[in-house]
Swiss-Prot record:
UniProt protein name: Glycerol-3-phosphate phosphatase
EC number: 3.1.3.21, 3.1.3.48
Keyword Amino-acid biosynthesis: no
Binding site for Mg(2+): 34, 36, 260
MF GO annotations: ADP phosphatase activity; glycerol-1-phosphatase activity; glycerol-3-phosphatase activity; magnesium ion binding; phosphoglycolate phosphatase activity; protein tyrosine phosphatase activity
Catalysed reactions, semicolon-separated: O-phospho-L-tyrosyl-[protein] + H2O = L-tyrosyl-[protein] + phosphate; sn-glycerol 1-phosphate + H2O = glycerol + phosphate; sn-glycerol 3-phosphate + H2O = glycerol + phosphate
Induction description: Up-regulated in white adipose tissue and down-regulated in brown adipose tissue upon fasting.
EC category: hydrolase
Effect of residue 73 to A: Abolishes phosphatase activity. Abolishes phosphatase activity. Strongly reduces phosphatase activity. Mildly reduces phosphatase activity
SUPFAM superfamilies named in the record: HAD-like
Record's function text: Glycerol-3-phosphate phosphatase hydrolyzing glycerol-3-phosphate into glycerol. Thereby, regulates the cellular levels of glycerol-3-phosphate a metabolic intermediate of glucose, lipid and energy metabolism. Was also shown to have a 2-phosphoglycolate phosphatase activity and a tyrosine-protein phosphatase activity. However, their physiological relevance is unclear. In vitro, also has a phosphatase activity toward ADP, ATP, GDP and GTP.
Cofactor binding summary note: Binds 1 Mg(2+) ion per subunit.
Catalytic residues as annotated in Swiss-Prot or TrEMBL: 34, 36
Amino acid sequence: MAEAEAGGDEARCVRLSAERAKLLLAEVDTLLFDCDGVLWRGETAVPGAPETLRALRARGKRLGFITNNSSKTRTAYAEKLRRLGFGGPVGPEAGLEVFGTAYCSALYLRQRLAGVPDPKAYVLGSPALAAELEAVGVTSVGVGPDVLHGDGPSDWLAVPLEPDVRAVVVGFDPHFSYMKLTKAVRYLQQPDCLLVGTNMDNRLPLENGRFIAGTGCLVRAVEMAAQRQADIIGKPSRFIFDCVSQEYGINPERTVMVGDRLDTDILLGSTCSLKTILTLTGVSSLEDVKSNQESDCMFKKKMVPDFYVDSIADLLPALQG
């Protein structure tokens, strides 16, 4: 039994067999997928994943894609989905299925800065993040390299700031520097300047067990220096689900979240009362699930999926015939 494999909880973390998958899919209208580690690894689709999603589309299931990656626009993600064989809308509707932290951060600022004339944000992040902000009318400054100017703190603090910056947005930024951190702190000395983080992922996993520092490390650096707490947009924050819900009109009882990370994907699903499926093609393992099940911490128990699969391709038999 899968329950024994995952830790003995009689109601949670059941292996999703073809028979169980048929029953589950009959109760579900919408499936929300994480991307990296679930649908693909880098530029390679998980074997069988494109066929599974095409079969779900053919069955009339509504699909959404929720990613903490802020380095691509939703249009760029839609192009990748099509390029790797997952299908999806084209033309003016391309990207409408994708809810990334770049896009959702832009929605958040549009809400919070409503009524502010010509809103402006200092962005520690990617051109894609800046592009999504610009698309909703928020001017972005700060993207790209920024090295220290001068010989010491007096020189660094003398560097001119952009006027009227109303938000500091921290995403994945390979050009993160002490100069940028210093500027962010200076902007945040204004009490009406918002601090927004795209996500709190501590690591970005790579192939062969390697990893690099994630966006959460950068957000924490700004929080500590500014002595401010960021508003977090991405999983497991409810805000990113609210973005999906507002555009899709989702019924949580008929929605499933599919992901490879317990602390983001599965926790989001649990928080938002969704059914959850863990796929073992990415970050989290059954040993991680077992540890959470055996913990006395109720927060960790929220990071236990309803079901698990070795790969989302395991859903395919339930969709055939």
